[in-house]
């Protein structure tokens, strides 16, 4: 039997993850040189955004708002991104940064799926779809590492 609280919390974490993913991609897009890499990142950003819309729609059924990414995690990501890019303006560095972010994101999402195991199947499906988007992006970026 599903638990509304677990459902809401899982959706909020997915929402924060989507926002973090979109923000991270936006941070690096202007530095990407390879058009194919840029296309991969833009496509992934669009998939993240669409999933964010699904998350918002489901949260609104519970009269809940989305969740912002952890401010400390966002700040650390910004610092790491800007430091690495300032030292190395190449696509390999950008791919490495995004892959690291995806790995952290998927790890967190698997943890949230376990923590909120009584969530509605529809919410679990959103989390799994986000994991799939992140894992596909990792696979797509391997050639740029």
How would you label these PLM feature ranges?
Residues 107-145:
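A generic hydrophobic-segment detector
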Residues 6-14, 35-53, 91-97, 122-133:
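Alpha-helical scaffold segments that form or flank carboxylate-/histidine-based iron centers
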Residues 25, 55, 76-80, 109, ...:
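Hydrophobic alpha-helical core bundles mediating ligand binding, dimerization, or RNAP-core interactions
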Residues 35, 69, 140:
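Localized chelating/binding microdomains
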Residues 51-61, 88-91, 136-145:
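Amphipathic alpha-helical coiled-coil segments
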Residues 2-32, 93-117:
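Alpha-helical bundle segments that constitute or directly flank the non-heme di-iron/ferroxidase center
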Residues 46, 57-106:
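Carboxylate-rich helix-loop segments that flank metal/cofactor sites and access channels
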